[in-house]
Amino acid sequence: MDGPTRGHGLRKKRRSRSQRDRERRSRAGLGTGAAGGIGAGRTRAPSLASSSGSDKEDNGKPPSSAPSRPRPPRRKRRESTSAEEDIIDGFAMTSFVTFEALEKDVAVKPQERAEKRQTPLTKKKREALTNGLSFHSKKSRLSHSHHYSSDRENDRNLCQHLGKRKKMPKGLRQLKPGQNSCRDSDSESASGESKGFQRSSSRERLSDSSAPSSLGTGYFCDSDSDQEEKASDASSEKLFNTVLVNKDPELGVGALPEHNQDAGPIVPKISGLERSQEKSQDCCKEPVFEPVVLKDPHPQLPQLPSQAQAEPQLQIPSPGPDLVPRTEAPPQFPPPSTQPAQGPPEAQLQPAPLPQVQQRPPRPQSPSHLLQQTLPPVQSHPSSQSLSQPLSAYNSSSLSLNSLSSRSSTPAKTQPAPPHISHHPSASPFPLSLPNHSPLHSFTPTLQPPAHSHHPNMFAPPTALPPPPPLTSGSLQVPGHPAGSTYSEQDILRQELNTRFLASQSADRGASLGPPPYLRTEFHQHQHQHQHTHQHTHQHTFTPFPHAIPPTAIMPTPAPPMFDKYPTKVDPFYRHSLFHSYPPAVSGIPPMIPPTGPFGSLQGAFQPKTSNPIDVAARPGTVPHTLLQKDPRLTDPFRPMLRKPGKWCAMHVHIAWQIYHHQQKVKKQMQSDPHKLDFGLKPEFLSRPPGPSLFGAIHHPHDLARPSTLFSAAGAAHPTGTPFGPPPHHSNFLNPAAHLEPFNRPSTFTGLAAVGGNAFGGLGNPSVTPNSVFGHKDSPSVQNFSNPHEPWNRLHRTPPSFPTPPPWLKPGELERSASAAAHDRDRDVDKRDSSVSKDDKERESVEKRHPSHPSPAPPVPVSALGHNRSSTDPTTRGHLNTEAREKDKPKEKERDHSGSRKDLTTEEHKAKESHLPERDGHSHEGRAAGEEPKQLSRVPSPYVRTPGVDSTRPNSTSSREAEPRKGEPAYENPKKNAEVKVKEERKEDHDLPTEAPQAHRTSEAPPPSSSASASVHPGPLASMPMTVGVTGIHAMNSIGSLDRTRMVTPFMGLSPIPGGERFPYPSFHWDPMRDPLRDPYRDLDMHRRDPLGRDFLLRNDPLHRLSTPRLYEADRSFRDREPHDYSHHHHHHHHPLAVDPRREHERGGHLDERERLHVLREDYEHPRLHPVHPASLDGHLPHPSLLTPGLPSMHYPRISPTAGHQNGLLNKTPPTAALSAPPPLISTLGGRPGSPRRTTPLSAEIRERPPSHTLKDIEAR
């Protein structure tokens, strides 16, 4: 039996290990340990992942010899790869959080060190041998059966050497006893061997068994095994296999193989959960289970074979032997005496295992469901049979470990964590996982014999979750399985594991969070804070090591406070990396107030600590003393643990802190510089989610500068945007942000140096830095992976920078220009429409503040261009006002009709579009009807201003709106005709006063749809990538063209004509992001030459210098090229406006005057409007992502772009928050953010519309 068992166990364990090794090789690029191991591992890796048992069955016992060969290389991997990988990883080694822990391990005999690296594995295996899937579990169990009574570290050595030798024969058997091997698996998972595999597996299995892996990882986070995110998952895989094995001794033998057959899927799934359960239970149950397995395994193994025969028949022969060796291996109690003594426990175990065996064969049937099935059987049997005792016995520790496990798994293992938490009450899939996990942590030293007594019952459910054993793998398993036989080693191991716990927490948190390895360091910092937050949750996790003997009593009560302190103290270090900006982001001002002490700031926020990063690192060491006052040895490991992660993190953070401290100085200078300050404010807007950030915008940039460094390293990894993490993903919501943000975090990690240096150092822009900190699309992303965006950033940044600061100054100037030019003309309208305009303005603040951005731009052009045109054609303008009003009212009525129909199809899309066109269109209607200059303004804004934009908008408008238009030719055409008439009149104002425009209106009303698409596209599209920009962009253009331009227009410095320019810019915006910048320069010259353009430019120079020139070049070119195109644009504009015929109908009469009033008011309010405008744009969630590519430009013109950024990135999801916060922020930021024109309504409207708008855009197009 031993031979077959060894063959099976070895095979299984070898497979699991070879799988881990294979994964580690893939991850770490390590050469395969051995050809046999590779073969077994590769076969087994797929088989383990897909059907471990089947592979093992297929390979049968022969693989046991083959796996035994690569096994030493795996052990070597564990030794060198684990440590090397850990060191390479940049944070605590897999096994050792600190170099001191590593040195301790190295100080241990090389064997011991290798096994200490395996120790989480070996000890876990011994404590969690019940998991039986771990290689070390088999090794450990063999070692345990032979040397289990002896020192666990000796057992570790034996586990490695003797265990490996015996494991080959006993390996499979011990896989069946994989319940104990669960910890072995955990330990091994923690070890470098499983490290690579588990890193990959943590990603593979993290997704596969997110909840189980979460449990496993969460507990691993607590234990050494979980040090590596990989360890938790690879162990999870094995644990799941083991878990299946753990269910029964018999089941473990037979069901584990069978489980391995189809446990490939289940192994990962149950692995994490079951690992947590089984490891916890195995800590306490292993010996009982193993002895039980010894006695009853044979009887139940036959049953299990009969039940599991269908799947793992080969394994069935070895289950008995496997159980026997395993029983030998786990005996914390003397293997011979404990096994017989545990015969009665096995009797307990057998009833539960038998059902599990019975259930288990079905589980193998459904590998996907195997996890669920296995866990539920584990639940049912553990919950009913073994969970009652273990739960009662482990409930206290389970409660603590529940928090621990749930908190440990909180980062990425929240799912298992709730099951853990509910394990006590609900004993759900992980009922024992936590209780056993707690015992593993808590009872490993003291309660493991009792735990084993419980474990007979608990073994059936030996979801013996030894994720804590990984924590305790070093400290708990040596002391735990020997049941305190080696407390000194236990202390050492505890120190080791404490250090590893931090490492595993940091690494596993990253793993559980699922950040890629490149993010692991970044997440390491961040997750050290985050995990320290979870370490607060995990407090008991640490304490179990200090209180391994009285873990239940001590761990629940003292551990949480101690760990609260310690994680808090350590957290300040890590969190200062992450939260140093995050809490500032939350508190905003406090971090800004103490920006010099990035850690001090946050340390103060998180904990009263010195502002010294190194001090923070030292404090974690000191805090551990307080935390681990009970066990100074543990404190020492914590110190080394903190020392290594602390040193690394502290050094990293310190360097980063120095860097961005220097950057802070630079940023302060930059902040003194309005542009740079604007930039800084904008990042703070990006970090605006923390309200104080708004006020501490300047200071916050410093803090964000730090966070930039820290956030880049830890914050971005931490989605730091934690404030912005979700919104960044919302940024990912669309392409630009999506590709920007996802990499932004990794790039933030890269940006720790690149962005950390660049964002707060190289770029030195608080905006860029906070962007990098918040993984904001612009600077960090741009700098790191968005260098295209970086050019965009610089282009947009630079162009909007000069426009943006003037907009601050220019709101009045623009207003004065508009007032000077349009005031004479608009004063009458203002007086007439004063009340109406105020009402309408209020209404349009909601409605038109969307167009308000275009309106501000058009109002300025209306005033400036209106001066040219109005002075030239005051009669035409008056006529147009009357005629346009008359026609606009019918048009609006018609639009109300057609809009009622079209609104169903196009209203949302149009309402969205019309929100932008509404600005544009309201401006167009009011301006087109009311003012020929507004025609220019309006046409340039959405259509004429940028041929590409116009074509974008016309194409989308004419393409998608042409369909509705043709569907409603009468209504749309009347609208078109009226609008075209007005618009054509305006355009023809210079050429033909009213007759030609009317003719164009009538004759071109339908054509403009196609003509605008065709003629507008040919001209502007030729100059701009509008073919795609029109239709393709308009998919984004409904929100992309519309919102992007609206959003980007302010960013591009088109703020006066945001609505008008907003449409064009999207077409420019995603591709023409650069083009608008280049185009603006080209347009600038042309517009400077162009009187209207120049007047518009002069009036809107600050914001529109870039936007307006290009807008007006497009406008002039468009008008010059195609009067009908202009008309079509107006038609298109009307069509977007047609969405709001009711609004236009309301405004119809007052639209021109009201538009003029709005032009003036928007000139005044546009600065505020623009800040709100981005917020309004944020309402268009799609465009923020579109803005994300445009965000550089948007980002650059910090006023509106900031709002856009914040709304898009930060407040894409919560535009309301952005709207509520950004208006003040933007007003704080820029000269024009002051007015929250139509902030919430617009955002709400646009928010409502953007999805449908995008869909309808796509649909209509």
Curated annotation (Swiss-Prot):
Ranges annotated as biased composition (Gly residues): 30-40
One Pfam family matching this protein: Auts2
Biological-process GO terms, alphabetical: actin cytoskeleton organization; axon extension; dendrite extension; innate vocalization behavior; neuron migration; positive regulation of lamellipodium assembly; positive regulation of Rac protein signal transduction; positive regulation of transcription by RNA polymerase II
Subcellular location: Nucleus; Cytoplasm, Cytoskeleton; Cell projection, Growth cone
Compositionally biased region (Basic residues): 8-17, 136-147, 526-539, 1127-1136
Knockout mutant characteristics: Brain-specific gene disruption gives rise to no visible phenotype at birth. Mutant mice have normal weight at birth, but then show decreased weight gain over the next few days, decreased milk uptake, impaired motor skills and impaired ultrasonic vocalization after maternal separation.
Gene Ontology molecular functions: chromatin binding
Main localization category: nucleus
Reported tissue expression: Detected in brain cortex in embryo, neonates and adults (at protein level). Detected in embryonic and adult Purkinje cells in the cerebellum. Detected in dorsal thalamus and in dopaminergic neurons in substantia nigra.
Phosphoserine: residues bearing it: S1200, S1235
Function: Component of a Polycomb group (PcG) multiprotein PRC1-like complex, a complex class required to maintain the transcriptionally repressive state of many genes, including Hox genes, throughout development. PcG PRC1 complex acts via chromatin remodeling and modification of histones; it mediates monoubiquitination of histone H2A 'Lys-119', rendering chromatin heritably changed in its expressibility. The PRC1-like complex that contains PCGF5, RNF2, CSNK2B, RYBP and AUTS2 has decreased histone H2A ubiquitination activity, due to the phosphorylation of RNF2 by CSNK2B.
Protein name as catalogued: Autism susceptibility gene 2 protein homolog
